[in-house]
Amino acid sequence: DEPMIWRYFVAPLPTKLAASQLDEREFVARFVIRINHTLDGAYIFSSGKNMGVFKANGFPEDVGEYYMLENYEAYSWTCHGRYPTNTPGWHPFALLDTTVVHNGEISSYDANRRFIEMFGYSCDLLTDTEVITYIIDYLGRKLGLTYPEISNVIAAPFWSTIEKQEPRERERLTYLRNAFASLMVTGPFSILVGYTGGLMALNDRLKLRSMVVGEKDETVYIASEECAIRVIAPELDKIWAPRGGEAVIVNLNDGGNK
């Protein structure tokens, strides 16, 4: 059966927003988390202004037909087409204009969850991927870290690697690892993060999950396997496998403003 989905285009009531003394994004984020935590039988899975999330249980071609994806245009797309084996939740997971798809299993989930829930988040959607979304939202939107800095928190370099850096870089990496130790993600994983104006791909430090990046003209393709890229773009200008813990960050020339 088709999923039961209601779509609304809304803005916070000005009086409620003013009374909350929050900015609009924080107001909406808190509302989404509250609904997902308190309302049984329903949840919000798409809450961005410039980000649409499409979820369903079925074959990819049927999902595309149901949502009429041929009518949409976007500068970036992320997709997760494999049903999870360890949890009943499935990807992508999103909050506001950030979305995450994930291949792997997070052994640090409980430690990450306990820490992030101290800051108003609530992990209720039954998958370890959800906590990565909240970690990125917390570090990026609330604390103002850049995506290279976020990658250094999530896939923090080994201490032996940090010690080999130049003094300034060593100091920076040491600070990030000490300050956000509870947000380091351990276990085998590869993630793809979509955000306004770009994408970030990241492997665990030991590269226990595969990830391949290809380029053709002005387009970048990222997948778990090269064959998935070749189906879409048989001829590539460049293809490579990023090292473990090495973030691949792709930004639009105009910053996603067009």
Regions found by a protein language model. Name each.
Residues 1-258:
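Conserved short alpha-helical segments that host acidic/polar catalytic motifs at enzyme active sites
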